[in-house]
Amino acid sequence: MNITLILFLIGILGFVLNRKNIILMLISIEIMLLAITFLILVSSLNMDDIIGQTYAIYIIVVAGAESAIGLGILVAFYRLRGSIAIEYK
């Protein structure tokens, strides 16, 4: 439980501190999702339930698809603007 909380807080901290870099924001979101998946997996192992393990595998597959789509959008954004930095006004 403590490891998942630490991972989730690292993800939140990375997201908050790197507001101008889209790649680091995506990595931070993936770290938070990994923490939640790890919590579901550990909880299902403690309760000896296979449904939680199935959910964890499903979440990992969806996260992989999400990352691929996000990076594809990021490449298109870079080709359009020439930069991936976020500008706040």
From Swiss-Prot:
Keywords: Electron transport, Membrane, Mitochondrion, NAD, Respiratory chain, Translocase, Transmembrane, Transmembrane helix, Transport, Ubiquinone
Transmembrane intervals: 1-21, 22-42, 57-77
GO biological process: ATP synthesis coupled electron transport
Compartment(s) of residence: Mitochondrion membrane
Keyword RNA-binding: no
Consequence the record notes for mutating A85S: In strain: A+
One protein family per Pfam: Oxidored_q2
Membrane topology: Multi-pass membrane protein
Enzyme class label: translocase
E.C. code: 7.1.1.2
Reactions accelerated catalytically: a ubiquinone + NADH + 5 H(+)(in) = a ubiquinol + NAD(+) + 4 H(+)(out)
GO cellular component terms attached to this protein's record: mitochondrial membrane; NADH dehydrogenase complex
GO MF assignments: NADH dehydrogenase (ubiquinone) activity
Function: Core subunit of the mitochondrial membrane respiratory chain NADH dehydrogenase (Complex I) that is believed to belong to the minimal assembly required for catalysis. Complex I functions in the transfer of electrons from NADH to the respiratory chain. The immediate electron acceptor for the enzyme is believed to be ubiquinone.
Family, similarity comment: Belongs to the complex I subunit 4L family.
PANTHER family: NADH-UBIQUINONE OXIDOREDUCTASE CHAIN 4L (PTHR11434:SF16), NADH-UBIQUINONE OXIDOREDUCTASE SUBUNIT ND4L (PTHR11434)
Protein name (Swiss-Prot/TrEMBL): NADH-ubiquinone oxidoreductase chain 4L
Record organism: Podospora anserina (strain S / ATCC MYA-4624 / DSM 980 / FGSC 10383)
